């Protein structure tokens, strides 16, 4: 234990949330809505909220609802197209909309500051991929969640959907697309700051910026002590509950916590790059989120997409992502992050995961040696008439892909994962996509795993029902409930 006096009441909290990104801010708002008197501390190493992975330019994609992302409907070894992930993510995103709608109804969120309605489109080329898209359309559109999905191979109709993409394209080219008009683009940086703005004036909440968590330890009675190093002062704080929502930085803090569950994990960082266009002639013409299909052998993170994005209220086009490599676990982290994370408990898992993912290694190597001309050539598959000078390369945020020790050895996992201590006193979020778009569902999982007794109480149950009118209902199997909650969400978020 730290050789310091026991923290006084001023330095004792009901919950300490590390990181002021979309995850911690979502959890902070949820806890404050459920019990306003809870003493919460949010600790952020940067100078403001939402500057790392939650920042709009650092996001690999937003508004993930499985409307257009083909990697959420993978083809199995037996040729079967699996839709389980698509329905799971669609339901999770609807829950995010439901939460935002409830806060908007209370006057605590202004939808137009972070949310824009935007069609979601899947676009493919050639007979084989068109056949796959038809199969996806057939399976998804037969269910209420995706009933509004449209399919076309008609060049005239496609020119109406995506005029910039169809400009200069040969009429003989085989191309197909699906579209769902009820899509969105989310500025998660602005949303994060909106969350923080609504709670930072509360007497029960402290937010410390430019403050780093140097270490954390648990005492014999289950309390956590965190050593904080700030720009203004250093201090020791205490809490019954800690959430590590520091993006790529969560892994190193999880390792410092020394909980047995954390020994199962390692991480592999992948940086991202975007081609960005701010030219009005292009941004006015393209108005959609358009996802293609990853090349054979390429990982899901490589799915190319051309997105209309509103970043700090300015409309831009982003194409990518292109992968890069940095040993940082955070964009504003240290080059030593990866090396410091290697322990005797996870080294074998990392080596095994590397051997089992040779294709990923080849993909990353090819990405690293790409020139800007190579990237523009990739963009030309989407935009035959592209003007290269209109597009600038920008570095996005860092992703730390999970490597987990399982009964089969070290496994590289592409999604997100909540890790909790056996006593529920600590939770950490690891991983990447779909991330921010499903933050609400992920944080409800944290509450159910770490605040179970409170979640069972009538007080919290009633509050949850107030925030989530559909809670307890499977909207994927109850069409009437799905349509009702979508009608409410669309009205309150002004998506109609």
Swiss-Prot record:
Functional pathway: Carbohydrate metabolism; tricarboxylic acid cycle; oxaloacetate from (S)-malate (quinone route): step 1/1
GO molecular function: 2-hydroxyglutarate dehydrogenase activity; L-malate dehydrogenase (quinone) activity
Pfam entry (one): Mqo
InterPro entries documented for this protein: FAD/NAD-bd_sf, MQO
GO biological-process terms attached to the record: tricarboxylic acid cycle
Cofactor requirements of the protein: FAD
Catalysed reactions, semicolon-separated: (S)-malate + a quinone = a quinol + oxaloacetate
Documented EC number(s): 1.1.5.4
Keywords: FAD, Flavoprotein, Oxidoreductase, Tricarboxylic acid cycle
Family, per entry: Belongs to the MQO family.
Protein name: Probable malate:quinone oxidoreductase
Protein species of origin: Prochlorococcus marinus (strain NATL1A)
Source species taxonomy: Bacteria, Bacillati, Cyanobacteriota, Cyanophyceae, Synechococcales
């Amino acid at each position: 234990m730290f050789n310091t006096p026991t923290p006084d009441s001023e330095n004792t909290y009901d919950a300490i949330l590390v990181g002021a990104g979309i995850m911690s801010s979502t959890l902070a708002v949820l806890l404050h809505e459920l019990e306003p008197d809870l003493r919460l501390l949010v600790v952020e190493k940067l100078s403001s909220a939402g500057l790392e992975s939650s920042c709009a330019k650092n996001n690999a994609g937003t508004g993930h609802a499985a409307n257009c992302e083909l990697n959420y409907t993978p083809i199995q070894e037996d040729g079967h197209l699996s839709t389980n992930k698509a329905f799971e993510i669609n339901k999770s995103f609807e829950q995010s909309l439901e939460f935002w709608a409830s806060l908007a109804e209370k006057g605590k969120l202004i939808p137009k500051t972070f949310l824009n309605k935007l069609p979601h489109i899947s676009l493919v080329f050639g007979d084989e991929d068109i056949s796959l898209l038809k199969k996806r359309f057939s399976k998804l559109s037969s269910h209420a969640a995706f009933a509004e999905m449209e399919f076309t191979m008609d060049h005239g109709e496609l020119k109406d959907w995506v005029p910039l993409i169809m400009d200069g394209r040969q009429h003989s080219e085989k191309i197909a697309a699906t579209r769902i008009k009820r899509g969105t683009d989310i500025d998660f940086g602005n949303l994060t700051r909106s969350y923080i703005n609504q709670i930072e004036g509360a007497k029960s909440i402290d937010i410390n910026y430019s403050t780093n968590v140097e270490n954390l330890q648990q005492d014999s009675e289950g309390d956590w002590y965190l050593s904080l190093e700030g720009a203004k002062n250093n201090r020791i704080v205490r809490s019954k509950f800690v959430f590590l929502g520091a993006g790529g930085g969560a892994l190193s803090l999880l390792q410092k916590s020394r909980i047995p569950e954390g020994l199962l994990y390692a991480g592999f960082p992948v940086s991202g790059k975007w081609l960005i266009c701010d030219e009005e002639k292009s941004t006015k013409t393209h108005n959609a989120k358009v996802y293609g299909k990853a090349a054979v052998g390429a990982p899901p993170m490589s799915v190319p997409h051309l997105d209309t994005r509103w970043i700090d209220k300015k409309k831009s086009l982003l194409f990518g992502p292109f992968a890069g490599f940095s040993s940082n676990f955070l964009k504003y982290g240290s080059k030593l992050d990866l090396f410091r994370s290697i322990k005797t408990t996870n080294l074998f898992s990392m080596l095994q995961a590397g051997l089992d993912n040779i294709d990923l290694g080849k993909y990353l190597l090819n990405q690293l040696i790409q020139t800007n001309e190579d990237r523009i050539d990739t963009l030309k598959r989407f935009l035959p008439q592209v003007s290269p000078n209109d597009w600038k390369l920008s570095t996005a945020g860092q992703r730390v892909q999970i490597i987990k020790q399982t009964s089969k050895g070290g496994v590289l996992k592409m999604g997100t994962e909540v890790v909790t201590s056996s006593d529920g006193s600590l939770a950490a979020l690891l991983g990447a996509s779909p991330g921010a778009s499903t933050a609400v569902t992920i944080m409800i999982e944290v509450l159910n795993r770490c605040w179970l007794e409170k979640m069972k109480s009538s007080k919290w149950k009633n509050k949850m029902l107030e925030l989530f009118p559909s809670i307890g209902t499977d909207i994927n199997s109850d069409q009437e409930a799905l349509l009702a909650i979508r009608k409410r969400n669309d009205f309150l978020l002004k998506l109609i």
